[in-house]
Amino acid sequence: LRFMLKSEGLPYEFLHLPSIKHEKKLPTVLSKEEVWRLLKSCQLLKHKILIGLLYGCGLRCGEVRAVRLQDMDFDRLQLKVVQGKGKKDRYVPLSKHLIRGLKTYIDAEKPETYLFNGQPVGRAGGDFDSRYSARGVQWAVKQACKAAGITKDVCVNTLRHTFATHLLEDGLDIISLKNL
């Protein structure tokens, strides 16, 4: 309504609309045992590594899709997250266990630019987005949950919330967590 009044050149400052109240639900968090079952239930190494990065590094969907081979530093045990939310770069730690899986995956799949390759978009000869699709990431998480027998409403961001919750439970201070 404000936009319409403003675009018509009419005064809109007097207009006070009530804001819509949204339910504030606590995020779903998986137990450590559920995360373990989730990882073990993955049929494809690609999905196991994908979920491992989402949980083990606390990555967002767009961030895991944008991981390039050059962003991984196995010597320093870290992953550079380029242009994450807020267009900020940051480094996140990689566990030795995850690095072992990443090396196996890279040797087997031979990705070129992005760690997780995508599919051609549209018809044959259409545009090609070399990144794995957001829907593909969501599907992999849902399939793993189904196979693991997890009945909670789990989405990609649930793994990020779970990552943060487990770090807090293990004694990491909130300021350090904020920087991850």
Regions found by a protein language model. Give the residues of each.
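Conserved catalytic core of the tyrosine transesterase superfamily
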Residues: 1-180
